[in-house]
Amino acid sequence: MIALIQRVSEASVRVDGEITGEINQGLLILLGVEREDDEAKAKRLVERVLTYRIFEDDEGKMNLNVQQVNGSVLVVSQFTLPADTKKGTRPGFSKGANPIDAERLYDHFSDLCDEKLTTQRGRFAADMKVSLVNDGPVTFWLQV
């Protein structure tokens, strides 16, 4: 399971022109679900993402996590993250989970986040328009 996390001052996602999720300070989490992923991996990744210290403390050091700054998260499914890009000029998607399992694990990941802090979501498998102001910019790729 892959999370591309971005520290944001604001982020939103729209489907058919309607906002489905919107946050201020926090993390935009683009989530890619791979074939071998399960609930245990989702739980480990949530714990890692929510405790990852990428927010600045009073001394300007990245020493605080999203919970410590009372931030929120916006979780957006991103089936392209597990793509195989090693050769050729077209990505392969055989490493990604099938849509039924991917949606179930996306929902599970989002529900686990929601137990800890305010969580907004995109819409699984929809054509989404994601807007964000990346604060830094600060972006990390986390994988379990």
Swiss-Prot record:
Its main location: cytoplasm. The keyword Aminoacyl-tRNA synthetase does not apply. It is an enzyme of class 3 (hydrolase). It catalyses: glycyl-tRNA(Ala) + H2O = tRNA(Ala) + glycine + H(+); a D-aminoacyl-tRNA + H2O = a tRNA + a D-alpha-amino acid + H(+). GO terms for molecular function: D-tyrosyl-tRNA(Tyr) deacylase activity; Gly-tRNA(Ala) deacylase activity; Ser(Gly)-tRNA(Ala) hydrolase activity; tRNA binding. A motif (Gly-cisPro motif, important for rejection of L-amino acids) lies at residues 136-137. It is found in: Cytoplasm. GO terms for biological process: D-amino acid catabolic process. It comes from the Bacteria. The keyword Phosphoprotein does not apply. Belongs to the DTD family. An aminoacyl-tRNA editing enzyme that deacylates mischarged D-aminoacyl-tRNAs. Also deacylates mischarged glycyl-tRNA(Ala), protecting cells against glycine mischarging by AlaRS. Acts via tRNA-based rather than protein-based catalysis; rejects L-amino acids rather than detecting D-amino acids in the active site. By recycling D-aminoacyl-tRNA to D-amino acids and free tRNA molecules, this enzyme counteracts the toxicity associated with the formation of D-aminoacyl-tRNA entities in vivo and helps enforce protein L-homochirality. PANTHER family: D-AMINOACYL-TRNA DEACYLASE 1, D-TYROSYL-TRNA TYR DEACYLASE. A Gly-cisPro motif from one monomer fits into the active site of the other monomer to allow specific chiral rejection of L-amino acids. This is D-aminoacyl-tRNA deacylase. The lineage of its organism: Bacteria, Pseudomonadati, Pseudomonadota, Gammaproteobacteria, Vibrionales.
